Each structure stands twice: as C-alpha cells, then as structure tokens.
C-alpha cells in the first residue's frame, strides 16, 4: 500500500467509532509545586504555565482545576535550604508545611486525588533521594 486510506478519518463519527484511545480529564494528573509562606507564586521557568505556590494559592488552584474536571494532583514540596539536613529530618516531621497542606487539601476538597512521593531528595542537604550514613 503506497497511500494510507483516509476513509477512516473522514468524519468525526467514523473517528470516534474506530479510535482506540480517548483521553479525558479523568486521565490527567496536574503537577503542583508547594512552597512555604502565604500568597506567593513563583514561575517554574522550565515549565511554562506552572508555578510554585504557597498553600493558600494551591488550594485555589486545585479548586479551579476541579471545576474543569481535573481531580488528580501530584504535589511536590520545595523545601528551603535552611530546612535541609543530611538526614532529611524535615521529610518525616509530622507537622511539616507539606504534610499540613496535604491534610488541609483533603479536608477542604475530599474528592481530590492527591499523589505524593516519598523521595527524600527535597529534604536532604546533599540532594540524595535516600538517607545515607
């Protein structure tokens, strides 16, 4: 066959009948980057349209996204240098700003799906993903 037949793409009805994959908002996971503080928004230069947000603005962003049908969010903490240690102790502190924010998100928006990562690299002063002695 030298030419691909276009008959299967001629109309929307035919395309929807034979498509193998349909992506909806149920399939999307929105990445969010959490910083400590209040009413701050910092652009992530390498990811246009993505920002580091404080807890108050992150809640508003999640509410907005849920209104659009996006319910799944992957929340990454951005830890200040002063809170990073060789043993990544901030990562397992029960009252950290990250865990407080996750609890607040679930309390205010129980229908949201929050995805987290147990990686230690945001908390370790040497940047390793695991604590090493």
Predicted regions: what is each one?
Residues 13-23, 55, 59-69, 99-110:
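Short amphipathic alpha-helices and their capping/turn segments at secondary-structure boundaries
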Residues 1-19:
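N-terminal amphipathic/basic leader segments beginning at the initiator methionine
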Residues 23-50, 113-133:
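N-terminal small/glycine-rich loop or linker at the start of catalytic domains
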Residues 41-55, 70-96, 123-124:
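Glycine-rich, proline-tolerant flexible connector loops at the mouths of alpha/beta enzymes
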Residues 1-2, 33, 73-75:
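Short hydrophobic/aromatic-rich motifs at helix boundaries and adjacent loops
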Residues 9, 27, 53-57, 93-96, ...:
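Conserved active-site and cofactor/substrate-binding residues in soluble primary-metabolism enzymes
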Residues 84-118:
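Alpha-helix-loop-beta-strand connector modules within alpha/beta enzyme cores
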């Amino acid at each position: 066959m030298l030419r691909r037949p276009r008959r299967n793409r001629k109309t929307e009805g035919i395309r929807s009948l034979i498509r193998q994959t349909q992506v909806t908002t149920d399939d999307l996971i929105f990445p969010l980057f959490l910083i400590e503080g209040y009413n701050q928004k910092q652009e992530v230069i390498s990811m246009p349209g993505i920002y580091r947000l404080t807890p108050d603005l992150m809640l508003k962003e999640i509410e907005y996204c849920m209104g659009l049908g996006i319910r799944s969010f992957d929340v990454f903490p951005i830890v200040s240098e002063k809170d990073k240690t060789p043993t990544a102790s901030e990562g397992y502190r029960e009252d950290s700003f990250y865990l407080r924010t996750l609890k607040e998100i679930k309390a205010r928006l129980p229908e949201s799906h929050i995805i987290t990562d147990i990686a230690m690299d945001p908390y370790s002063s040497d940047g390793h993903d695991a604590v090493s002695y």
